[in-house]
Amino acid sequence: MRITGGELGGRRIPPPRTGFVRPTPDAVREALFNLLPDMRGGRFLDLCAGTGIVGLEALSRGAATAVFVERQAVNGRRLRELLADFGLQGRSRVIIAEVRKGVKILMEEGRKFEVVFADPPYERALIEGTVACCRRGDILVSGGLLVLQRSVREIIDPVVEDRGLILKAERRYGDTVLSFLEQAMED
């Protein structure tokens, strides 16, 4: 596994230390960052971060900051080590917590992000809960994007648009689908 672009492009990331991580493949990450707006100066949130490869990619491509929320402590500690090895600790933060608690912490701090990337474990009925958590947490800037990585066998509840998120696009890569939901603009 390697970072595909930006200042850290080509740097290798060690494999996960647990068997419960499914890193986003290189080709899917490249496609993701080709579809996202320019990350330079932006704030990026990586939920269900696992190895942290997607947030590392955002930092490599110019994001001002990235916050990683990862439930498994072994992965969170390893991610902190990687960020230090790459000299990124001043632009990043790792929260070792499940998504709901991590979002609550960020909400209480008043943090908002241009891009929130969420990659919950496939086919465990976590997509709707992740979307609802992000909406309740009010962590997206007006016009910000929530990108969900999910299995092709999972669907997004059509009521997400009633929650202030608009499904803008979906892209399929084998069994993986990236869904791009935009935070409705404030009046």
Set out the residue ranges of the language-model regions:
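Class I S-adenosyl-L-methionine-dependent methyltransferase catalytic core
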Residues: 1-187
